[in-house]
């Protein structure tokens, strides 16, 4: 009679079961790591967009200050950030920047004092609840604001 070779352990399915459990555990770990990487990439993209928005707000304020302090009319061109369109919101206007947009900063005076008038070809004259010395940029998903400008704008 021929005797078959036997494995040194009796639980023949145990090795494959342990291997499956280990692979599932590794898959779970890599899924969590991948989710963290994707969230971090989205956060980087949002922070880069916010940095661009702050730069636009600083430029907007600089043009308004230059028009006010030098008593000159300034014509500035604002463009979308890559393929991101945005809306510049003032106290009584909303300017949609969907393409190259020319904005005119003109110093004016009325009974309430001096201010810088903002004129543009695609202005929506809506009443916003924004103070005269504040500007906001909306990207739809989030809004970046500058609430303490040096000059009043309308």
Curated annotation (Swiss-Prot):
Keywords: Fimbrium, Secreted. It comes from the Archaea. A motif (QXSXEXXXL) lies at residues 14-24. Disruption phenotype: Deletion of the gene leads to completely nonpiliated cells. The N-terminus is cleaved by the prepilin peptidase EppA, which recognizes the class III signal sequence. The keyword Membrane does not apply. Residues 1-13 form a propeptide. One of its GO terms (cellular component) is extracellular region. It is found in: Secreted; Cell surface; Fimbrium. Contains an amino terminal motif QXSXEXXXL, which is part of a class III signal sequence. Minor component of the type IV-like pili. Essential for pili formation. This is Minor structural pilin EpdC. It comes from Methanococcus maripaludis (strain DSM 14266 / JCM 13030 / NBRC 101832 / S2 / LL). The gene is epdC.
């Amino acid at each position: 009679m021929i005797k078959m070779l036997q494995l040194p352990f009796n639980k023949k399915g145990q090795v494959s079961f342990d291997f499956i459990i280990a692979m599932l555990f590794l898959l779970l770990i890599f899924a969590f790591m991948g989710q963290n990487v994707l969230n971090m990439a989205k956060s980087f993209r949002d922070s880069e967009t916010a940095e661009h928005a702050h730069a636009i707000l600083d430029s907007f304020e600089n043009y308004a200050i230059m028009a006010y302090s030098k008593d000159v009319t300034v014509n500035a061109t604002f463009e979308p950030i890559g393929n991101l369109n945005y809306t510049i919101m003032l106290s009584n206007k909303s300017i949609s920047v969907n393409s190259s947009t020319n904005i005119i900063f003109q110093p004016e005076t009325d009974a309430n004092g001096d201010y810088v008038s903002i004129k543009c070809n695609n202005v929506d004259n809506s009443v916003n609840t924004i103070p005269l010395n504040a500007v906001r940029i909306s990207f739809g998903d989030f809004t970046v604001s500058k609430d303490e400008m040096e000059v009043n704008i309308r």
